């Protein structure tokens, strides 16, 4: 439909009622017929239709004869006449009732035809030219338009037009698509004598030209994309957009490739780039369960907190090796603190032995699994050796902890600034030299060690198994005390790192052990003579104990779960863990980082 074609829709709908030869001499002043009976509400319902309000079966020409007398007769002429200017004359015969064909259910008659554009094609005036009866009559020279009140129920016909002086000037540029132009009119009952007015301001022509009534776009509803409107009705010409055209809904569109993954609520599940679920659940229980299943709890070494100045201590499960004949190897808990090394009974925690830090002369590793330290009392002439056996990691940890504890105890008890390393080495060497000379003087020639195995207890060589006899003599290893033959005790080595230490007979096994021990002792001595190393070790011990004490207290205070002391099966370090409520839980050792299971029972 082209712009300016104002009659095509009319021809399409009412072509059977179109009169191609209109009356050339219409009667400007028809005689009023007998007054017709006003139709009741039932008649109005049956006879009215949406497109032609003024022509119903219950109304005669007298209903609007007064309206037409207010204007001069308007006849046919050759000028361009807008199709919306009615003649307000009654036809020579009653108009036939229009067909019962229902127009578009969403279409409304605008009942106000604004002035058409100046360039318009002429058309013959139909006998039904007064069909658009609600359009205002426009004087050729007038600049104002008058709008007659329209009663939607057609109770009293048309009222007289307002005087020109009271008509407001229309807005030359109204909003063409304003939804407020079609607000509901005041409703009145069918028997009211005062007709309610349905006044509308002027609007521009619909540039799209949907139909013969020049409806604006707002008649089609708020949905301009052919979708169903909120009221459930479909606008006209919904097939004019073609198939597959839908309204854009930006807020409801999901990202490409993620259909079904858009969040519907705060408890929904999202997915990352690798397809793993990302939960934003507000439930604290769910988050705690997921975190526990995804992460293994790390247990820290157990540290007993004491109220005195000794600070925190650490316990290690080790084996106390026998040093003399008659002793047995026992399992103990080695507790290292600033007060010394305590050997505790694992079952009763009773103190079996105590070695104060000030009495410990040195500490070194005999091999990867044995730690030895020497301790003496004021009544002892020579320091006694104590050997502790464990795995390699625990042995290294024990060595570092004992060394740091010794230097920290000296710094706390003595002066905070120890003597220089050169003087310390000289004084230590002099003392060791004098003590060694004195020990060599007073030591008997045939001295037997306490840990030596008696000769009568062994009849064969411990290493090669040769039977002892007149030609195969028994020899004791000065390090381990076992009995060997001469061929298995060819090694000679000093058992200590002292300068005047004598070379003694050792077995082949102890030869390698003592050599490794002496090399470790030299490295430890070179590391300990540095002042910075002393401070680092002391600081390390203090920080480690403080951290363990805080973590242990935090676990006790922050959690209502029962705590339990568990020994790591790998490094034998005692750990303080939370006992699970039921079943078992995987715990990671804070020392060796190896996982193990802790059961609820």
Curated annotation (Swiss-Prot):
Membrane topology summary: Peripheral membrane protein
Phenotype when changing residue 341 to A: Localizes predominantly to the nucleus
Induction remarks: Not regulated by iron starvation. Induced by abscisic acid (ABA), salt stress and osmotic stress.
Compositional bias (Low complexity): 176-197
Consequences of knocking out this gene: Seedling lethality when homozygous. Degenerated root surface structures and vacuoles with altered morphology. Accumulation of ubiquitinated membrane-associated proteins. Hypersensitivity to abscisic acid (ABA) due to impaired targeting of ABA receptors (e.g. PYL4 and PYR1) for vacuolar degradation, thus leading to their accumulation and an enhanced response to ABA.
Keyword GTP-binding in annotation: no
Region Disordered, annotated ranges: 1-240, 542-561
Tissue expression notes: Ubiquitous. Lowest expression in mature seeds.
PTM comment, free text: Phosphorylated at Ser-530 and Ser-533 by SNRK2D/SNRK2.2 and SNRK2I/SNRK2.3 in response to abscisic acid (ABA). Phosphorylation is necessary for ABA-induced FREE1 nuclear import.
Cellular component terms per the entry's GO annotation: ESCRT I complex; late endosome membrane; multivesicular body; nucleus
Keywords, comma-separated and alphabetical: Abscisic acid signaling pathway, Coiled coil, Cytoplasm, Endosome, Membrane, Metal-binding, Nucleus, Phosphoprotein, Protein transport, Transport, Ubl conjugation, Zinc, Zinc-finger
Compositional bias annotation for Polar residues: 63-79, 125-155
Region named Nuclear export signal: 338-344
Annotated binding of Zn(2+) 2, by residue: 477, 480, 507, 510
Other known facts: Reduction-of-function FREE1 alleles exhibit enhanced sensitivity to abscisic acid-mediated inhibition of seedling establishment. Seedlings overexpressing FREE1 exhibit increased sensitivity to salt stress.
Note on domains (UniProt): The FYVE domain is required for PI3P binding. The N-terminal domain (31-86) is required for the interaction with VPS23A and B. The C-terminal domain (515-601) is required for the binding to ubiquitin. The C-terminal coiled-coil region is required for the interaction with SH3P2.
Subunit structure: Part of the ESCRT-I complex. Interacts with VPS23A and VPS23B, but not with VPS28 or VPS37. Interacts with IRT1. Interacts with SH3P2. Interacts with SH3P3, but not with SH3P1. Interacts (via N-terminus) with PYL4 and PYR3. Interacts (via C-terminus) with SNRK2D/SNRK2.2, SNRK2I/SNRK2.3, ABF4 and ABI5. Interacts with SINAT1, SINAT2, SINAT3 and SINAT4. Interacts with SINAT5. Component of a phosphoinositide 3-kinase (PI3K) complex containing ATG6, SH3P2 and FREE1.
UniProt protein name: Protein FREE1
Organism: Arabidopsis thaliana
Protein's gene: FREE1
